[in-house]
Amino acid sequence: MNPGYSSTASQPGHNPSALPHDVHHALPAIGHPGSYHASMPQLPSIPPSMPPHYSDQYGMMQQPQDQPAPSSTTEGGAETKPSADAVARTQKKLQPHVGEQDGRKYRLDVVQQPKRARMCGFGDKDRRPITPPPCIRLIVTDAVTGKEIDCNEIEHTMYVLNVDLWSEDAQQEVNLVRHTSATPSISSTTPASFAQIDSTPPAFAQIPGTNREMPSYPQSQAYAPSVTPFAQQGGYGQQAISPVGPHYGMVANTYGGQGGYTYASPTDMHPHQLGSQVGPYGPRIFNGAPDMGMHQRMALQGTHQGAPPQGMFTRNLIGSLSASAFRLNDPQEKIGIWFVLQDLSVRTEGIFRLRFSYVNVGAPTRTPNGGPANQTSILNTGKAPILASCFSDAFQVYSAKKFPGVCESTPLSKCFAGQGIKIPIRKAEGGGKNNDDDDDY
């Protein structure tokens, strides 16, 4: 017998002959160790081309850190490139948007592309920005002649650039991240978008602290009038129920003047109670915490059968997500209108892209019919169209252990820092023990 193999028959207390007759025949026959090994379920073997750090996360594979392009692995270990259709969709999505307004065309040019960053997790104490800082130049041309308009003739004080975080293939917005478990671990998160929250089924409750109204089933029925602790004190307004369609009754919480909304299931109330709450019976109402802000938002979990687990939603891209325009000189002493995004960080690791959208929040000079607008304010109080948008190159966000360090300060960053833009500039090599922390503004 193999010394590394011991059967249960040789152990005390496990002699098959001492067992009852029917139990003895019900036991599986113990044969050669090779046959026992062959009867055990075999786990899938790890492909030979898989990096070593995959061994502990097999089945939850992520994109290799040294491969910027998305790829998949076949059973034989060979890597396959994205299909032609996927590449075509990505190329189509990456096409910049050029808008036109008042006889001028607007286009964005990402002169300084982001390259890498270190993930900051869910703490903001040791947050590192994306390096080098993205620098975007706004190019304004005449719609008829196509010539670039002089920057001195452009009033840029109301120009704003917004930034979003997108996936590597530019097909999905990943501005949010959600915990997939009860513990707030950065390794158990999935990216999400605002559109996915808006399409959440009624089983999942609202996101407190926002104007997005999400329906929610109450956790249980209550045969008592619904009264909040604030209403018992008599210091706040009572709750009024107004009908919202044939299926839900909306309950407005008037605490503090903040519009938190919850929804009650129609199964917990009679049809005549949809319009108003009458009688001693009413649905149990759960009011979201009014002091929860946009930074960390909790999705309240439904309790009906089939509801997948919900967790906390928080922003994946943090920092200054918008920037004003500046008239700056580049290293070649050419003046232009620039947007500098020097304070952007990503919570999770992966490969991402940034999408930049330019809007003019100033009051329109012309009406939609083409006539002169009555400018009573310098600020646009209505809707402002996106006049130009574009994507950045793909950049990689590393974990703290794999982060190779911040990029060297570029001549463009040093040039803008000399003109008053707050860009972190690294000191000369040898000036400090840890170059990653030797950043000046």
UniProtKB/Swiss-Prot annotation:
Listed GO biological process terms: sporulation resulting in formation of a cellular spore
PROSITE patterns the UniProt entry points to: VELVET
Cellular compartments per GO CC: cytoplasm; nucleus
Phenotypic consequence of gene deletion: Leads to reduced formation of conidia.
Domain Velvet per the UniProt entry, residue ranges: 100-426
Polar residues biased stretches: 1-14, 60-75
Chain segments carrying region Disordered: 1-104
Main location, first listed in the record: nucleus
Subcellular location per the Swiss-Prot or TrEMBL entry: Nucleus; Cytoplasm
Residues annotated as signal peptide: none
Highest taxon of the lineage: Eukaryota
InterPro entries to which the protein is assigned, alphabetical: Velvet, Velvet_dom, Velvet_dom_sf
Keyword tags: Cytoplasm, Nucleus, Sporulation, Transcription, Transcription regulation
Role this protein plays: Component of the velvet transcription factor complex that controls sexual/asexual developmental ratio in response to light, promoting sexual development in the darkness while stimulating asexual sporulation under illumination. The velvet complex acts as a global regulator for secondary metabolite gene expression. Component of the VELB-VOSA heterodimeric complex that plays a dual role in activating genes associated with spore maturation and repressing certain development-associated genes.
Family: Belongs to the velvet family. VelB subfamily.
Subunit structure: Component of the heterotrimeric velvet complex composed of LAEA, VEA and VELB; VEA acting as a bridging protein between LAEA and VELB. Forms a heterodimeric complex with VOSA; the formation of the VELB-VOSA complex is light-dependent.
Protein name: Velvet complex subunit B
Species for this entry: Pyricularia oryzae (strain 70-15 / ATCC MYA-4617 / FGSC 8958) (Rice blast fungus)
Gene it is expressed from: VELB
